[in-house]
Regions:
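Catalytic domains of cell-wall/extracellular-matrix polysaccharide-remodeling enzymes
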Residues: 17, 25, 294-372, 418, ...
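Terminal accessory/targeting
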Residues: 1-270, 354, 358, 365-470
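Short, well-ordered alpha-helix to beta-strand connector turns
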Residues: 45-46, 283, 338
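Conserved hydrophobic/aromatic pocket- or pore-lining residues that grip, position, or stack substrates
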Residues: 199, 289, 333
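Metal-dependent polysaccharide deacetylase catalytic core of the NodB/CE4 family, i.e.
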Residues: 202-206, 219-229, 242-328, 344, ...
Length: 470
């Protein structure tokens, strides 16, 4: 099925609308033709009209089967500069908080084919991380705090709100045209995919630091004999963790992305070289773990030059400690020819920083065009669950929280991006390795493929179903 999307809106919001349409409809099997000229709309039975309240199409009797989305002047004014969104300006549809609701009740009453909120403006707000430009608060690492966001205030951080908006749109399309939008298959021939990754933030720690780590985490230590034996064993051989994790993944037939820092202490050169040799030429992926201050200090170019000898196929990156601001991050990684970023997560909780479960591009509000770097937002990080700065859960709660979040996320389709640090396994080593294997096995039993960020980048790069006509 082909769906025409007619844009009858001012040029001041046209680039934002095209960007949003391309990203929110890319996960579907249907073809979409986007145009600002009526004569290019060949399919009059399946047409979405995005227009102003004054548009002549809105009152044309020949457009009875069209679905209308209204762009209001107040929305154009909102996006003309950076400011917080007014949370009094909400409507709820099936308990879903919809921003940019239509305020003209007369139009709503007179047209049953009208979406009661502006899904284009609402989706643009989340996908572009628009709110982060107006948030002045920063934590000690210079990051936007989750508590300052609309996701926190509306309690929707664990809900992909853009997916919910698209579900509402899909219901309207089904009622109007008697058809359902179908999602594309992800790699693995399912509607969901798990992107698994590990950060190597340090190769090893001293015995003194290891003991301190254990003492500081006594709150979460599972006191049993097998964990005690593991703790004693890893007192002298903590680097065995890498092999243990690799063995589990190889046994289960899953693959992961390994994010390597730009450099490690010279004494670990042989170990790092052996790791690279293990993963190169396999279905695993090596990617770049930019240092924590690389974005803030504008050092990406220098760091990229330093890793060229590691693996010529490196195409993605993630920032250490998720320390960045949106525009500076994507400007620098685009300038240095990375293909994807895997940093977009608020570390305080699991969830959806951009409100969407599919990989997408980020809009640059300064240059008014999308960045060329694909965002594969991160959804789960082990540190979020076990670090005392964040949720600080005991292991039995960690597993339950993870499984509940994963189960809910798979209902939406798309990509679930999971980061497990190797250091996670330094505490409760035996039981955490077993937990890790149980979680991976559970995902496999659901028919979900577990693989790399690079595989998702390749999938998205080939997903071309939006045609723009002038």
């Amino acid at each position: 099925m082909t769906i025409s999307i007619l844009l009858d809106i001012p040029e001041s919001f046209a680039k934002q609308a095209r960007y949003t349409v391309e990203n929110i409809f890319s996960p579907y099997n249907e073809d979409f033709v986007v145009t600002d000229k009526f004569e290019n709309c060949n399919n009059e039975n399946n047409r979405i009209v995005y227009c102003m309240e004054s548009s002549p199409y809105l009152h044309d009797p020949n457009f009875k089967k069209d679905l209308y989305i209204i762009l209001e002047n107040s929305s154009i004014e909102f996006f003309s500069h950076f400011k917080p969104y007014d949370l009094n300006d909400l409507s709820y549809i099936e308990k879903i908080p919809c921003i940019f609701p239509l305020k003209n009740n007369e139009i709503l009453k007179s047209n049953r084919n009208l979406l009661p909120f502006d899904i284009i403006a609402a989706s643009f707000f989340f996908l572009s991380c628009w709110q982060e430009y107006s948030i002045g608060n920063r934590d000690k690492k210079g990051r936007v705090p989750l508590k300052s966001t609309i996701q926190y205030k509306l309690n929707i951080i664990r809900k992909p709100i853009v997916n919910e908006y698209l579900r509402i749109l899909g219901d309207y399309i089904n009622k109007l045209w008697g058809t359902e939008l179908e999602h594309k298959e992800m790699p693995g021939e399912a509607v969901s995919y798990v992107s698994l990754s590990h950060d190597i933030c340090w190769i090893d720690i001293s015995l003194k630091k290891y003991i301190k780590l254990v003492v500081n985490n006594r709150h979460v230590i599972v006191k049993n004999f097998s964990n005690f034996l593991s703790a004693v064993r890893y007192l002298w051989s903590r680097t065995r963790i890498y092999k243990k994790v690799y063995d589990i993944e190889e046994k289960l037939g899953v693959f992961s992305t390994i994010f390597l820092l730009t450099e490690y202490p010279a004494k670990y050169k042989y170990f790092v070289d052996s790791l690279i040799k293990t993963y190169c030429g396999t279905n695993f992926e090596l990617a770049h773990h930019l240092s924590g201050m690389s974005i803030m200090n504008q050092n990406v170019k220098q760091e990229k030059a330093m890793i060229k000898h590691l693996d010529s196929s490196i195409c993605g990156e993630r920032v250490h400690t998720l320390r960045f601001d949106i525009n500076s991050l994507f400007s620098q990684v685009e300038m240095n020819a990375y293909n994807y970023d895997n940093s977009l997560l608020f570390p305080e909780d699991m969830g959806y920083r951009t409100g969407f479960s599919y990989p997408h591009y980020i809009f640059d509000p300064i240059k008014k065009k999308p960045f060329k770097v694909l965002a594969i937002p991160l959804n789960i990080m082990d540190t979020t669950l076990v670090d005392r700065k964040y949720l600080w859960l005991k292991d039995e709660s960690v597993e339950k929280e993870l499984l509940d979040f994963i189960s809910n996320s798979l209902n939406y389709g798309g990509v679930l991006s999971v980061l497990i640090h190797y250091s996670f396994f330094l505490i409760n080593t035996k039981s955490r390795l077993e937990m890790y294997e149980r979680i991976l096995t559970s995902l496999i039993s659901k028919g979900v493929k577990i693989g790399t960020c690079r595989e998702i980048y390749t999938w998205r790069d080939k997903s071309k179903n939006i045609l723009f006509l002038k």
